Structure formats: structure tokens, C-alpha cells
Amino acid sequence: MRQVDLAKTVAIVCVVLIHVSSGPLLWESPDTARWMQSLFWGSVSRFAVPLFFLCSGALLLDEDRELTVRHIWTRSIPHLLTALFFWAAAYVIAPFVYRWNFDRNAIGKGLLDVLLWRHEQHLYFLHIMLLVYAALPLTRAFLHRLDEKTRAYALCFWCVTGCVLPALKSLGLFFAGGIPAQWPLSMTWSAIGCTALGWALRKKPLRVKTSIAVILLGFAVCYGGTAALSLQKGELSSQLLEGLSPGPLLMAAGVFCLCGEIAPKLPKLLQKGAEAGGKASFGIYLAHEFVLSAFRVFGVTTWFAPPLVSIPALAAVCLLSTFAGVFVLSKIPVVKKWLI
């Protein structure tokens, strides 16, 4: 599906931009030009994870796709679990390899953490996708049997409980106590609703002008809101940058719909590039932190140029390096099947 390939390619580029820009956002002061430039890249790319959820929904909830409970539990979930624990263990061992200093006690403790589901931070996406896959038979049955009005109501209900209320709660603006304090959904459960939105937007996409408008609105919320909150606090205040908060979700919806409009019109060479990027996106997501951690170990930072230039430059090096590694790994059948 061309739309999904292009969207996944855009999403993985943005994942790397987020991770490269996170360092300056955490270490530098909000009242500096460098921080504001870093926030630009951190905001403009913030839709990456919800865009991946939208892509998953567009593919996995498609009525024409046969997806049985047996396939989910004998192929999809074992694939995710194998990849998750392999890469989590690899991230534990990697720092010792970089420094060529093998501390058995430290490695043992790290591997125990892996068994206890304490993994490299960015692997949280796989934790969520395990639940998304487990719920697929229910999500598919629920969506495919509802009439259009009830589906629209369900999406609105999810948007309020899974997007708006959690954002208000994180900002300290949801003052309800008792049971109402439990109304906001966690990001993990909200991701299921996001996949449903992806399915709905593939069937009935936003118009081009509307897509552009919601992208700009989402960016304004991320950049303007985060800048204002951070300047007030004196350090990064990231509530409006969270994956399924309103800003990133608005941008993701707009970008997903624009990809549907643009993808069929791309020249063949770019279509092939988008297809390659889409296929490699999962592997790049899993492995790109190796390159970024190597940057940190060897002292490669964004300080060689203004962040407006250095962040995309480092992201490009990381992407190309990781893509090359994933391409080589994909030639090994067992790795291609289970680990990327």
C-alpha cells in the first residue's frame, strides 16, 4: 500500500529527528536560540509514533485482510516478543562492547532487567504493539460491525478519553478526584483507538486543505505550547510533546492523509524509495539507537553547527547508517523473519 509505505518512511525519519533533538532540549536552557532551534525539530517531527499507529490500523484493520487469532498468536506476537527481547539484550551489551570493558556483574544485572521488561526506552513502542495485536480480533469485529454514526461516536469518545483528558491531566488542568480521576486512558490503551483512527482515515481521508490546517495547528500546539511552558518552568516541559497528546495526533492525522494524496503521484524512483523505507522502518526503529549511542560514546554532538543544521545532519547519518545495517541483516533469512 503506497500510502502506508510513504507514511512509515516519513515516520521513521521523524523518530530519528526526535531522538537527535532530545539531547539539546534536555541539556540546554529554554531561553537560548539553540534550544528554540532544537525545539523546532523536536516539534515538527513529533507525530512519528501516532503516525506508526495510524499505519498499523490502516493495514491490520482492513476488511480485505485475513487475520486470524491463530496467526496473531503463533506469528505476529512471537515475532514482536523475539525482536523485543533480542534488541533489549543487545542494548544492554552494546555499551560494554563500545568501551571493550566487560563487567560480568553489570551485564548480568542488565540482562535481568531485560527479563523483567525494563528495556531501552524507545522499545516502549513494541510493548504497546503487543497489546494492539492481542486486541486486534476484538477491534476488527467492533469496527466492522458498527454503522458509520456509531463508529464516529466511538472515535470521538476515544479522542476525549484517550487524547484530551490525558493531556489536561498531564498539564494539571484535570481537577476531578475519586473515580472520575480514572477516566483518562493510558497511552497504551489509547493506542488501540489510534489504530481505529488510521483505519477510518484510510477509508475517508481528510481533504488536502484540512490536512494542511490540522498539521499547522498541531505544530503550533507542540512548538508554541512547549516553548511557553518551558520558558515559564526554566527547563523542558514536555507534556504537549507526548505521543498521543493533541498536537502530535493532529499532525499525524494530517500527514497520513497527505501521504494518501501524494503517494500515487510520486515518480517511480521515489515510490521505490518509499517502499524500501517502509519495509525497513521497523528494523531502523529497533536498531537506530546503536548509532546514536555510538555518537554519544565517541563525543559526536550537535555542537558542531547550529541545531537547525546539526540535528538533521546527524539524523541523516544515523538513518543512512542504520538503513545500510538493516539492509545487510535482511539478507539473513532468520533475522529477516524474526528480528527486524
Predicted regions and their residues:
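Structural signal for the C-terminal ends of transmembrane alpha-helices
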Residues: 58-67, 137-146, 197-206, 257-267, ...
